[in-house]
Amino acid sequence: MGGMSGLRRVYLARPRGFCAGVVMAIEAVERWAEALKEKGELVVYHEIVHNRVVVERLQAKGVHFVEDLAEVERLRRERRLADTVVFSAHGHPPAVRRQAAEMGLTVLDATCPLVTKVHTEAKRYAKEGYWILLIGDSADHQEIKGTYGEAPERTILVAVHTHVGKDPRLADPRTVEVPDPERVVVLTQTTLSVDDTLATIAILKKRFPKLVVPSRKDLCYATQNRQEAVKRIAPKVEAFLVLTSPHSSNGMRLLELAQSLVGRAYRLERPEELRPEWLEGVESLGITSAASTPEDLVQGVVARLKAQNPGLEVVEEGAWETIAFREPKPLSPEEVLKGA
């Protein structure tokens, strides 16, 4: 671990780690897995949050994760299920809700309220005859699938400007076309880089002068806060560690931001992935984590750094968030169909 021996100070970004939506979703799964264990095992549609450690810990408690509700039929033959499905924090298309109800499943919708807000806007603008330009980083991201599914006939997927060409299903904001340029609105995936999202909206605004632009509040507060925390620390450090899954959009945007500001930024999911050569010549280090990364993983990294540097100074920089979301209530198949 010789590469870490010169480290003198670590700045821990605040806020970091779990946001209110993630806390709500994970706590809902844990509570209902325990409450329903006499009836059977719980099923979650998609990873509850994009973090492998979280998923593995829930699997150890008997929770099953599926990417297609058709998998529930197979599980019913192999396991004793509680006939309850939890929808992940990222949102889901209306067709999935209907499918769950038609299968007789009770639904716990753990979609983040901020994502639900975007879904509501998509439905409203589509009903009013607008064309929706939905900015995202991948057509495969669960949040994009969910929002697109609310109004597929009126929605055009657009790449955030830094990702143009990476996914051919996402249009270039500089050349995208809509059937009616007079009635067009922009919505966004909530976990993108705030700066990149605003830059992409500016490009679209030039192309479509009558573009309806939601308020900045439509960008996820947790995404903004974590990115601002990295910006505050960046001038004080020579390298950054970002604890995130490669599937976490908000986490990967933190990594890109840290790389752009500091130059040396490294991704890891678990403390044991820390590599000494990353910290060669580094005296001051910044650490942050994605909105779906458990805090104990961050503390595990700090413990490893302290073991190599007994006099290491650890500075908590910034303030924690105080927002909390209510846990979802179970919905019967009839209630789901009524609201679908």
From Swiss-Prot:
GO terms for molecular function: 4 iron, 4 sulfur cluster binding; 4-hydroxy-3-methylbut-2-enyl diphosphate reductase activity; metal ion binding. The keyword Metal-binding applies. (2E)-4-hydroxy-3-methylbut-2-enyl diphosphate binds at residues 50, 90, 141, 190, 248-250, 292. GO terms for biological process: dimethylallyl diphosphate biosynthetic process; isopentenyl diphosphate biosynthetic process, methylerythritol 4-phosphate pathway; terpenoid biosynthetic process. It catalyses: isopentenyl diphosphate + 2 oxidized [2Fe-2S]-[ferredoxin] + H2O = (2E)-4-hydroxy-3-methylbut-2-enyl diphosphate + 2 reduced [2Fe-2S]-[ferredoxin] + 2 H(+); dimethylallyl diphosphate + 2 oxidized [2Fe-2S]-[ferredoxin] + H2O = (2E)-4-hydroxy-3-methylbut-2-enyl diphosphate + 2 reduced [2Fe-2S]-[ferredoxin] + 2 H(+). Isopentenyl diphosphate binds at residues 50, 90, 141, 248-250, 292. It is an enzyme of class 1 (oxidoreductase). Keywords: 4Fe-4S, Iron, Iron-sulfur, Isoprene biosynthesis, Metal-binding, Oxidoreductase. The keyword 4Fe-4S applies. Its EC number is 1.17.7.4. Pathway: Isoprenoid biosynthesis; dimethylallyl diphosphate biosynthesis; dimethylallyl diphosphate from (2E)-4-hydroxy-3-methylbutenyl diphosphate: step 1/1; Isoprenoid biosynthesis; isopentenyl diphosphate biosynthesis via DXP pathway; isopentenyl diphosphate from 1-deoxy-D-xylulose 5-phosphate: step 6/6. The active site is at residue 143. [4Fe-4S] cluster binds at residues 19, 112, 220. Its cofactor is [4Fe-4S] cluster. CDD domains: lytB_ispH. Binds 1 [4Fe-4S] cluster per subunit. Dimethylallyl diphosphate binds at residues 50, 90, 141, 248-250, 292. Belongs to the IspH family. Catalyzes the conversion of 1-hydroxy-2-methyl-2-(E)-butenyl 4-diphosphate (HMBPP) into a mixture of isopentenyl diphosphate (IPP) and dimethylallyl diphosphate (DMAPP). Acts in the terminal step of the DOXP/MEP pathway for isoprenoid precursor biosynthesis. This is 4-hydroxy-3-methylbut-2-enyl diphosphate reductase. It comes from Thermus thermophilus (strain ATCC BAA-163 / DSM 7039 / HB27).
